[in-house]
Amino acid sequence: MLKVESLYYTYPDGHEALRGISLTVHEGEKLALVGANGSGKSTLLLHIAGAVKVQQGRITFRGQESQEVLRKNIGLTFQDADDQLLMPSVVEDVAFSLVAGGMSRSKAHERARAILDSLGISHLAERPPHRLSGGEKRIVSFAGVLAGEPEVLALDEPSSALDPRARRRVIDFLHKTKHTIILATHDLDMALDVCTRAVILSEGSVACEGTLPELFTDRKILEANGLELPLRYS
């Protein structure tokens, strides 16, 4: 479904963020991208979602190599949900991309409310985003992405700054959705709860990959890549 081949990326300051990364994501799969801070997870996710232009290498979605195809089919959420919640109300935030794409305001709001209802948060529709809890903001950010009807959800640290209850709510959503998921996280316990396969990144390269939970029970592999055993195995 999605293939990354020999992907390199260097920032203007000379930092090599990605060094020849290759990986494949299969349709319906829930894949974890894990690694220590600075391993390249977020940069890779931005490329996969078409938010950053490829410098060297290629990314194809269903055989098509196009930044526009990636943007259309892969929905990206940022580590900080506040970066996606900029409108006066939740329903306006969720409807924003639809209105920007040419849909009438009334129809966009109708669709946005249907999405909020499907996620069990229709009661938040008129609430200002800045008055939401961390967990509510995260789910609303998912709603905004779902409005674009992507085939793949690319999620950057979705458990960041969440309390246990909010974290559980996010995990429940990820369990229920039928979308293909690429989950970039350092939260190995969340990866175990959601994903069946993981790719470990280290200094911009693929260090290893494997199935879960097997990969995350190997202390030597995890420690070699700056990671610790998940809490459930500690």
Named regions from a protein language model:
Residues S106-L124:
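Conserved ABC ATPase "signature" region
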Residues S205-E228:
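Conserved beta-strand-loop-alpha-helix hinge in the C-terminal portion
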Residues P128-L132, E136:
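Conserved ABC ATPase signature
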Residues T185-H186:
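H-loop/switch region of ABC-family ATPase nucleotide-binding domains
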Residues A191-D193:
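A short, surface-exposed alpha-helical micro-motif characterized by mixed small hydrophobic
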Residues A49:
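Helix-to-loop junction immediately C-terminal to a conserved catalytic motif
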Residues Q56-L70:
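Conserved ABC transporter NBD signature motif
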